[in-house]
Amino acid sequence: MTRQNDPMTSGLRERKKQKTRAAIRRAGRRIAAAHGWEAATIERIAAEAEVSPSTVVRYFPVREDILLTDEDDEHLEALLRARPAGEEPLESLRAVTVEAIGAALAADPEELRLRARLMADTPAVRARFTETTAETGRRLARALADRTGRAPDDLEVRVFAAAVLGALREAVLYWAERGLAEDLTALLHRTLDTLRTGPALPARP
């Protein structure tokens, strides 16, 4: 008889959970892409994913997380920790965030475009995105603290991590508001350059 805590059983259970989570995400995004976010109700997503509404709620207590959440935060933190020692914090964050967003764009451009459009057009999605980036900010702050010899709750560390994530959010919104026509990678670099220098002053006559 297989024990409850058998590693094989636990592994199978975890893979099943991951498959269910992925199916719910795909269903929600398909409905949102075709009909808009308001049409992506819990009941409709459940039917599309072939699960019960209670299963959808169990995996995603906040509906917008179906659209917004992924498993990338841990990977992003690991990338930041792997950057060369002594590298400027802004350049470290530039490298890892541009790499992560570029990889997402290459892997599934339509998914990233959908997220960006709904963030720009749907206040509830935009608000939830702001909330979910708080955990990303905490992870990045921990890594920055370790790299700079500061405490994770150091004001400068928290402000810096939050500023970078806020700037990147504005870059994605800017991209979406202009029809997703511009080169996103170039916009990300432009955004982080602006964070370093501020907006250029007008030329004096």
Q: Predicted segments — roles?
A:
Residues 74, 110-138:
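Short secondary-structure transition hinges
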Residues 47, 61-62:
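Residue-level detection of the helix-turn-helix DNA-binding "recognition helix"
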Residues 130, 146-193:
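Hydrophobic/aromatic-rich alpha-helical bundle segments in the mid-to-C-terminal region
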Residues 1-7, 180-205:
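C-terminal peripheral helix-coil segments that are non-catalytic and often amphipathic
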Residues 77-115:
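Hydrophobic alpha-helical connector segments
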Residues 1-39, 43-51, 78:
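Basic, helix-initiating cap at the start of DNA-binding domains
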Residues 24, 62-67:
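Short amphipathic alpha-helical segment with a characteristic S/N-K-E followed by hydrophobic residues
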Residues 51-60:
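Short hydrophobic/aromatic patch on the recognition helix
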